[in-house]
Amino acid sequence: MKRSTGGTQPKGLNVKRSKLADARFIEVESPALSNGAVDLKKFIESRSFEITALQDAMKRSKESSAQRAFQALPRCLRRRAASHNIKRIPKGLRDRALYEMQLSSSSTLPIAPSRQRLKRFIKRLRRKLAKSGETKAIDSTGSLVTDNSTDDSRIPSLAAVKLIRGKFAGRQLRKVWLPTHLWVCKRAHMINAWGYAIPEKPTEKSYRPTHRAAFRKDAIAFDMSYEPLFCISGPYEALKEKFGNSFANGLPPVFLNSSRSFTSYLVKSDIHELICPCFLQWNNPTEDDKKQIPVKNPTECVQLVIRLHPSAFLQAWNYLSGIAVLDDRIAMHDWRLDLASFDIHGPDSNIMLHKVFDDVELDEAGKVWQSISNYSSACLPMGASISVKALVNTRCDKNLSEKGEKSLLDSAENSLPASANQYSTHFRYWERQEIPSFAVFENKNRHTHEKKSSEKEVIPVYITYRKEWNGLTVILPWDYAKFVWRKMMYQKGIRFGGLENLHQIAFEKRMPFFPIDYPDTISGQLCEEERKKRNEDSWKRRPPAKRVNYQKFGDNFSEIGNPFCCDWVYLNEMVKASRDEDKTLQLVRVQVQLVQRGSLQDRARIYCLSDDELSKWKTIIYKENLTAENLLYPKCPNETAIIGFVTTGNFNLNAGKPSGIANVLAKTIKNEKSGYCIIRNVGCSVPRLAQWKFNQSH
């Protein structure tokens, strides 16, 4: 029923516009001139009237706005469900929100303090304190099953979960909270994976903002503390001899004698099985740390620091420890839950990180760190690593926008290099021929760091540039990570992301994302099983009339293999049934991109093309310019032509067209670096011509 309008109020879309125009109308008076002469009395009255009219128009314009205080907030701070609670609004807008609540006709009133409520709270608190003294501490949290633990702690056994005491200890018995959990869990969707509570994606819309932060301007930060850190200690010659074949590119000495990190693939050299990609860094421990390493001749030891994906950690640890246990010169150290790590991606990641670590000790590394404060991330040398001692505020109630106490920096020494010669001089820091030493890998406990005051402590921080991500990786002690993260999130121009956002950035950079795009690994197979179950459950929850019938769609077309996953089992059986001599399922990761318009989705089927079929497709596309509805549009090849699946497919905002990461049979592409194929989405009978490209760097 329409709402009746009283009087002769105009109808249409211009009602609101006319009201706003009337509210902003300012009345004026005549110049008060008589025969060219100024009448002083009338002139003052006219100007007084105009000033009053201006003030009245400003007031009416302000009151005519339909925007409330909570609506004036940026999207990331809006709490529409709790807009009646002024405590959910920043302090600068609370007075305005309280005033609007009092003027409104609703019965919502600000909550008045209650003495009875306070008494009940104190009583409950006393009961909890009395009960906490009677509870027993948790003695053990179990251990992971490892194959090669030794009694002399050279190869230690692994703890399943870090021992936690406190208010939320019961929630962390079967999973580990990241150091930023209390901040992130209010702002992101959380998932339990690989024994950790990990943010999946922010609660606000983040697909396009993630693209802008990672590729256009600003930066995006990820808490990567769930990726385990551990190291292998021993003489370099022993490590190169035992583990040289376990990494795809070996252990070249060029990275040993320079402050640079590098990435590689961990493989089982005896059976040529890929385990996972990994991040590597050489470290020269101090003499005191060398004495504590339980190996023969500890003074000759160097450390190979490794960071990899948590889904492959146990497999990698068992494989590497199986090699290390045979040589008493080699030891392994588990640094999980002792060291936290952040990844900051984007063109301004270096500038943002300098705003966080703006107060460092001015040793040689500290001066180099300050000299590159205004450089873009792309200007840094590939794999450049540096260790600084930063002053961290450990008080959460301080205003992080203020400088606080006097900085450790001298303003004269904190200036940027004035010439290109000074620029190159500072960058020679990463060309020195010596084994680097990083303090963060030595003192990992919180109470061993120097205290400058009751609020600030000096902690070691490791920072390295990752060229493939165009960002920086930060490693720091676990207990200080929450303070650094909080300061980082209060910087203008930086946002946080979750697992889905990290996958999106890798996809737009056309990089395979582990473990989703690695079906030839054990972790990738387990991940595909989880995705299959999730897709099938989502399909079953939909009503029959609203879900795709994979048994019959299009022109009597039925889906090939399991429609809820990339069915590698089906492809493997098809390879075994073929007449080829090589009946092994060897996969190669390639990039795919549609030639024409269309959509590209996960689990899409890839078909090979003969030369005759390719010429027919090119004739139709480039000459006749026909659409998919045309009768001359080629039909989809039969099931024997399937050569792979698209593991990640979507619209690529960086490329401006649909693209994807796919895995195809190695024998079908031979030695070619690019070619054409046919791609068909799951539940769709229309094929699309696509171009694949082999990327050797990934």
Swiss-Prot record:
Which InterPro entries does the entry link to? Answer: Pop1, POP1_C, Pop1_N, POPLD_dom
Q: What is its EC number?
A: 3.1.26.5
Q: Which UniProt keywords apply?
A: Hydrolase, Nucleus, rRNA processing, tRNA processing
Report which gene this protein is encoded by. Answer: pop1
Record organism: Schizosaccharomyces pombe (strain 972 / ATCC 24843)
Q: What does this protein do?
A: Required for processing of 5.8S rRNA (short form) at site A3 and for 5' and 3' processing of pre-tRNA.
EC top class named in words:
hydrolase
SUPFAM superfamilies, alphabetized: Folate-binding domain
Top-level taxonomy:
Eukaryota, Fungi, Dikarya, Ascomycota, Taphrinomycotina
- Protein name stated in the entry: Ribonucleases P/MRP protein subunit pop1
Where is this protein found?
Nucleus, Nucleolus
The subunit structure is: Component of nuclear RNase P and RNase MRP complexes.
GO BP term, pick one: tRNA processing
What's a GO cellular component annotated to this UniProt protein?
nucleus
Q: What molecular functions are annotated in GO for this chain?
A: ribonuclease P activity; tRNA binding
Write out the similarity annotation.
Belongs to the POP1 family.
Q: Could you tell me what reaction this enzyme catalyses? A: Endonucleolytic cleavage of RNA, removing 5'-extranucleotides from tRNA precursor
Task: Name the Pfam families for this protein.
Answer: POP1_C, POP1_N, POPLD
